[in-house]
Amino acid sequence: MTDPLERSGLVVVDKPAGMTSHDVVGKLRRFFRTRKVGHAGTLDPMATGVLVVGIERGTKFLAHMVASTKAYDATIRLGTATHTDDAEGEATWGEPATAVEDSAIAREIAALTGDIMQRPAAVSAIKVDGKRAHERVRAGEEVELPARPVTVSRFDILATRREGEFIDLDVSVACSSGTYIRSLARDLGEALGVGGHLTALRRTEVGPFRLDDAHPLDALEDSPELSLSLDEALARSYPVLEVTDEEAQALAMGKWLEPRGLKGTYAAVDPQGRSIALIQEKGKRLATVFVARPSTL
């Protein structure tokens, strides 16, 4: 019997520079011959690296992994700010960074590490009164997005280069979903009084998915294969709880099980190794939050 989910799962793409995340989705729709394609976590056109894309029922799973932590390698230029907070924008202000000492840079980076309030980049996909912020900025509007809590668990300097009036910092960042690396560049430049923006960005991790898992687009065009089946995606993203065939059937129908004292979300896997659902304890019930293999399939 053919598995109804054999074409459902995730593709981990190494996005090239110059393409939007939506461009990548469009190509994968053509490669996999389906309209049911979506991505988790937008990458700016200038950015490269890990873009997780759902295929078929894998698109339904994306909503349950967007809160994952992410990691980036980036280059920050100190000495000028831009209206987009990256190299694609127009310069707005700046001061020579020649007098900025390494100790001052380290101090301000430490202040941007941990649980912080961050103002998102104005040129972003965040919606303001139903319209994306970047659309309002490009229409000439002034957009000031409110700060929101994010977590920067790692903000390390890998290399420092002093070139004329500028300082270029190669950095490695690990952060919560929703953190803007462009905003870190902007805020570091502002704190140092010289302005700052991002000149390069490469995403190296999204949750459990890393560059080692990623495939270039040209390879996917030649051989459109899933990086992980939906079964593998659930089991890799969450701790596994083995269930009986009877329990699996109940979960597939959206029914709940007796509580087991579990904390957090688990992937319920049947004796055949198939991921049936994501489950959480809610009060006195062990209930589904996402059913990968509904009984209606």
UniProtKB/Swiss-Prot annotation:
InterPro entries: PsdUridine_synth_cat_dom_sf, PsdUridine_synth_N, PUA-like_sf, PUA_sf, tRNA_psdUridine_synth_fam2_C, tRNA_psdUridine_synth_TruB, TruB_C. This is tRNA pseudouridine synthase B. The gene is truB. CDD domains: PseudoU_synth_EcTruB. It catalyses: uridine(55) in tRNA = pseudouridine(55) in tRNA. Keywords: Isomerase, tRNA processing. Coiled coil: none annotated. It is an enzyme of class 5 (isomerase). Belongs to the pseudouridine synthase TruB family. Type 1 subfamily.
